[in-house]
Amino acid sequence: MFRNFIYAIFSFLLLVFSVTQSSCQGKKDPVPEVPGNKAAVKVGAWYFGGWSFPADQNGHTFHISPTLTTTFSDREPVWGWREDKAGVMTEQINYAADNGLSFWGFCWYDNTLVDDAKTMDNLNNALDLFLKAPNKNRLDFCLMSCFPVSPVNWEKICDRTVPYFKEGNYLKVEGKPVMVFFNTDEVISGMNGIANTKAALQLYRKKAREAGAGEILIGARTATRPSDPTYQNKYVECGFDFLTTYNNADDGRSNAGANDYSRLLEGDKKSWNGISAHSALPFVPVVGTGYDMRPWALDHPNQPASDFWYTGMTPQKIAEQLRAGMQWVKANPKKVPGNLLFLYAWNENGEGAWLTPTKSEGAARLNAIKQVIQDENK
């Protein structure tokens, strides 16, 4: 996953904590009921805000990299690579809302455990631009915390994120703001175990209530574990409210190198069924639009990268992938909070997953998914 790239961009010093995870055995806390199920499926997409870093003399940044802008230039959005040009955020919101999307899930980064906080904050520029956009209320939004946590920065994360929950267009299920943690296992290890993580989440909830945001729904990003079906039990012990994924590319991989896009649908289904069947926690499914991080891997060879990619994506195939996901949600109403579904992704153009209209393809992907959303939500 490219989040490993993000961790490696910056030179930072993490404080070292002993990991003392408590046992997953014994009596579990009651699992919350799945709230907010309605007839319509609410489709959103993950948003990666890596497109506004200061550029070099050639216009390149870590993410707007030379190979991406040349060999893979077909991925360039119609407004160009940068998301911070005047009017671009307004344009993006209109494209998303006009084509049936209900919300974005912003990748959000705390800047405490890094040497260069200002550079890290560039990853949150898109969220700031979104909240300043005149048409922001056309979409709901939520946050996914993507950077390591520890007792050092936990309260800061709480205090920085709780105010967002009070925004009028913050994504809620039955009035409860939705918050996700990308690096869930690192949260547990960073907080020194399950018991401390549970206490930290309780503090988070307390701060939200005291700020007037009410009760919150806290999600744990996870992945399938066929060799250990009970792997997700620890998230129940910690007090997370639901599970989700960011993408399911690894689950569809059949070999190194090129894999047909049909394999990604199989990976998505493996995630939806495999995770939800082995956990009592509610589950929000993710539908993939592609995965191919070769441009970043080629430009940053010292960073970890996947050895595979998907080919054969078309607007029609992506739309049918979404249809399968929406039908899964409707077939499993007791498992999915708020009938939510995430698409991976709105703008992971560097990772090979995007819905943004491009100079090469126009808005064909958006037009195709719009029709599916309308059909499935009749």
What residue spans do the PLM features occupy?
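Positively charged n-region of N-terminal signal peptides that target proteins for export
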Residues: 1-5
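Glycan-processing catalytic domains of CAZymes
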Residues: 30-378
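Bacterial Sec-dependent N-terminal signal peptides
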Residues: 19-35
